[in-house]
From Swiss-Prot:
<keyword id="KW-0560">Oxidoreductase</keyword>
<keyword id="KW-0223">Dioxygenase</keyword>
<dbReference type="GO" id="GO:0016706">
    <property type="term" value="F:2-oxoglutarate-dependent dioxygenase activity"/>
</dbReference>
<feature type="binding site">
    <location>
        <position position="289"/>
    </location>
    <ligand>
        <name>Fe cation</name>
    </ligand>
</feature>
<keyword id="KW-0479">Metal-binding</keyword>
<feature type="binding site">
    <location>
        <position position="233"/>
    </location>
    <ligand>
        <name>Fe cation</name>
    </ligand>
</feature>
<keyword id="KW-0408">Iron</keyword>
<feature type="binding site">
    <location>
        <position position="301"/>
    </location>
    <ligand>
        <name>2-oxoglutarate</name>
    </ligand>
</feature>
<protein>
    <recommendedName>
        <fullName>Bi-functional coumaroyl CoA and feruloyl CoA ortho-hydroxylase F6H2-2-1</fullName>
        <ecNumber>1.14.11.61</ecNumber>
        <ecNumber>1.14.11.62</ecNumber>
    </recommendedName>
</protein>
<comment type="similarity">
    <text>Belongs to the iron/ascorbate-dependent oxidoreductase family.</text>
</comment>
<dbReference type="InterPro" id="IPR026992">
    <property type="entry name" value="DIOX_N"/>
</dbReference>
<comment type="function">
    <text>2-oxoglutarate (OG)- and Fe(II)-dependent dioxygenase (2OGD) involved in scopoletin and umbelliferone biosynthesis. Converts feruloyl CoA into 6'-hydroxyferuloyl CoA, and p-coumaroyl CoA into 2,4-dihydroxycinnamoyl-CoA, but has no activity toward caffeoyl-CoA.</text>
</comment>
<dbReference type="GO" id="GO:0002238">
    <property type="term" value="P:response to molecule of fungal origin"/>
</dbReference>
<feature type="binding site">
    <location>
        <position position="231"/>
    </location>
    <ligand>
        <name>Fe cation</name>
    </ligand>
</feature>
<dbReference type="Pfam" id="PF14226">
    <property type="entry name" value="DIOX_N"/>
</dbReference>
<dbReference type="InterPro" id="IPR005123">
    <property type="entry name" value="Oxoglu/Fe-dep_dioxygenase_dom"/>
</dbReference>
<dbReference type="GO" id="GO:0102312">
    <property type="term" value="F:4-coumaroyl 2'-hydroxylase activity"/>
</dbReference>
Amino acid sequence: MPSTTLSTVLSDINDFVVKQGHGVKGLSELGLQTLPNQYVHPPEERLSSMDVVSDDSIPVIDVSNWEDPKVAKLICDAAEKRGFFQIVNHGIPIEMLEKAKAATYRFFREPAEEKKKYSKENCPTSHVRYSTSFLPQIEKALEWKDHLSMFYVSDEEAAQYWPPSCRDDAVEYLKSCEMVSRKLLEALMQGLNVNQIDDSKESLLMGSRRININYYPKCPNPDLTVGVGRHSDISTLTLLLQDDIGGLYVRKLEHEAWSHVPPVKGALVINIGDALQIMSNGRYKSIEHRVMANESNDRISVPVFVNPRPNDIVGPLPEVLASGEKPVYKPVLYSDYAKHFYRKAHNGKDTIAFARIE
């Protein structure tokens, strides 16, 4: 692209990246030599090598035998002590994982004119949203990431509204994650003295599902920005499929240090969300995590968020409090909690205070 055109783009980043639908991917492909000021984050929000614990990582759990009590114990221990773990031999074929990744690339390689059909301004449903950064309209510093978010209601709605370039593989992958989610939650509920997930519990734990596809293009100055800022998820569980590039970092519980989550072929990264932290009365931990930008490679990831339904009341489960344990959190309407999360830029775990009993 001629330098004059590049200068024009840089003079109005919001128009090019957000309104025209090019995203940060389009910005990266201009051949930038330096990071635009809009993406420069304050030093305290950047991650340096001094902050990373190199000899520490989250557990990798073989779940080939879901019925083994030892597997359930490993899952519960990881949820209590780390909030993050990886699972292997989970039953989703490698071929399906690869198809989900390929679908991600297909969508983001579409022309900007096609992608922007799914922006807030253009898409006829709020259940599908193409965007860049997290909340670009209010953030002081933008995140180096594009994403497409798809809230699943039915196959019929997906067929009508989800992008054709990724729809079929995204729906298939999302459905394949349902069994894994259920098995994980069965194990986690055992640790909370919940012996059976009945219909009401199932709705509360996994009543709604959302799949995102994320694209992190290579960045000219990755040390000055973030792929995703510090945050915890508001889900019950998140199941993350990452590629082989790496870049996800997790805060160590009660420490300022961070651990890298190395890609493991065929694995899914599992993390506890705020909703499950609240339901477990703090026993299971929803942990801050972040994504670093990369100078050499484009990176993708595919998270599936397993959530309560918007009209569900989320609070400590009765089984958790049955022994007389004092509640740490008050019951909250899940849609109110979600609105609180989306009110401002990523800022660690501050959203959980919305439900905490003072």
